[in-house]
Amino acid sequence: MCDMIESQPAQKIGKMKKLRRTLSDSFSRIALKKDENAIDEICVTKMSTRNCQGIDSVIKHLDPIPEDKKVRVQRTQSSFDPFEKTSNQPTSPKFGKADSYEKLEKLGEGSYATVFKGKSKVNGKLVALKVIRLQEEEGTPFTAIREASLLKGLKHANIVLLHDIIHTKETLTLVFEYVHTDLCQYMDKHPGGLNPENVKLFLFQLLRGLSYIHQGHILHRDLKPQNLLISDTGELKLADFGLARAKSVPSHTYSNEVVTLWYRPPDVLLGSTDYSTCLDMWGVGCIFVEMIQGVAAFPGMKDIQDQLERIFLILGTPIEETWPAVHSLPHFEPERFTLYGPKNLRQAWNKLSYVNHAEDLASKLLQCFPKNRLSAQAALNHDYFSDLPPRLWELSDMSSIFTVPNVKLQPEAGESMRVFGKNNSFSKSLSNSKH
């Protein structure tokens, strides 16, 4: 089942501002290093999720921070490096420099970030530039620090690659691989439910990426179709780690204001902050149903109360026998909810019955009681995937599932396969983060 990740104690606002200011300074100083290798090590406070080591002389300017609070986040390696030089190219701008990229059209804008399509001046390859505006008093937004630090340590075919970090006085720019579309756009383009074989491949990739980060004690916390990027070859990649949380990442508290309402689990809706990997697995179940059925599983129209009613109408209103200690949750008031019994999922989403083992898998993901939800690794071993080639379970982290012979997306209803289109998903998945 799911793994628990303990909440961190609340931090005082003053201390958090000081921390953000210090980390902002560290980004700035690293960005100004003359040694191009210096940018490969970003010093952050309590943010690494793997391969933590001591801090060397490259970043001695952070000595005021206690040694036990310092960790290193390694630069992600990938098959595509925007600074990979071809033989006929002259010396180009350094790693971590703004003039290494050309901004193309704007793709999207959020409260604190604007996303541009960009191009590496070294080799002409496309990138996505997430430009985060900095405020003098606040420094680098904490969610930006979190996203950058986590992604720098993640190496997986189903996680969007962070290639570069550029820090100036006014902005922090995260340079991502360019991905053509996202699952939300893909489903909009193919209404009525996706090809069942494609659903299986998308879900398998989603679970691969989640299993990887969960093993590193990282929660994504904002799973939704807009945050699942899809390349022109069909690779699905987890994106927008602005709300992601590592076990060692400090914060004011674990907020329950995470995950778009439709994909938010009932325990979080009821005020629980005792998060585990189960939080993400509820989102997986919602996305799975949506891909098959062609409509959102629980499309609440009003508020949290309405969202919970939609969930309980299908899964049953929780009681102590089905959800131990549910009455202890901050927002659980039994008198507010109609008492429903659980239904077979096919009664609500009939297309689940068309695919072998789909209803069973969905039912094991969409469990109101968090501890009853399947883990990502357990879901990968479900019978629903039994007809896929065994080699898929033997792939290395950085290997795409499409390297396995005969694994490919199938045409959607009424269409032959083609490149998904030019619309880039970063306009939603990156600029709509909490930065």
Swiss-Prot record:
The catalytic activity, as recorded, is: L-seryl-[protein] + ATP = O-phospho-L-seryl-[protein] + ADP + H(+); L-threonyl-[protein] + ATP = O-phospho-L-threonyl-[protein] + ADP + H(+)
Q: Which residues make up the binding site for ATP?
A: 107-115, 130
The domain of life for this entry's organism is: Eukaryota
**Which class of enzymes does this protein belong to?**
transferase
- Any one Pfam family match given in the protein's UniProt record, by short name: Pkinase
Map out region (Disordered) in residue numbers.
Answer: 75-97
Q: Name one GO biological process term.
A: G2/M transition of mitotic cell cycle
- Report keywords, A-Z: ATP-binding, Cell cycle, Cell division, Cell membrane, Kinase, Membrane, Nucleotide-binding, Serine/threonine-protein kinase, Transferase, Wnt signaling pathway
Checking SUPFAM superfamilies in the record gives:
Protein kinase-like (PK-like)
Q: Which residues form the active site?
A: 222 (proton acceptor)
Provide the E.C. number(s) assigned to this enzyme: 2.7.11.22
* Molecular-function GO terms, alphabetical: ATP binding; cyclin binding; cyclin-dependent protein serine/threonine kinase activity; protein serine kinase activity
Bilayer-crossing regions: none
Q: Does the keyword ATP-binding apply?
A: yes
Please state where this protein is localized.
Answer: Cell membrane
How would you describe this protein's topology in the membrane?
Peripheral membrane protein
Q: Which Gene Ontology CC terms are recorded?
A: cytoplasm; cytoplasmic cyclin-dependent protein kinase holoenzyme complex; cytosol; nucleus; plasma membrane
In which residue ranges is the amino acid composition biased (Polar residues)?
Answer: 75-92
Q: What range(s) does the Protein kinase domain occupy?
A: 101-385
Q: How does it assemble?
A: Interacts with ccny; ccny mediates its recruitment to the plasma membrane and promotes phosphorylation of lrp6.
What is the recorded function of this protein according to its Swiss-Prot or TrEMBL entry?
Answer: Serine/threonine-protein kinase involved in the control of the eukaryotic cell cycle, whose activity is controlled by an associated cyclin. Acts as a cell-cycle regulator of Wnt signaling pathway during G2/M phase by mediating the phosphorylation of lrp6, leading to the activation of the Wnt signaling pathway.
Similarity comment:
Belongs to the protein kinase superfamily. CMGC Ser/Thr protein kinase family. CDC2/CDKX subfamily.
The family database entries (PANTHER family) matched by this protein are listed as: CELL DIVISION PROTEIN KINASE (PTHR24056), CYCLIN-DEPENDENT KINASE 14 (PTHR24056:SF154)
Protein name (Swiss-Prot/TrEMBL):
Cyclin-dependent kinase 14
Native source species: Xenopus laevis (African clawed frog)
Originating gene: cdk14
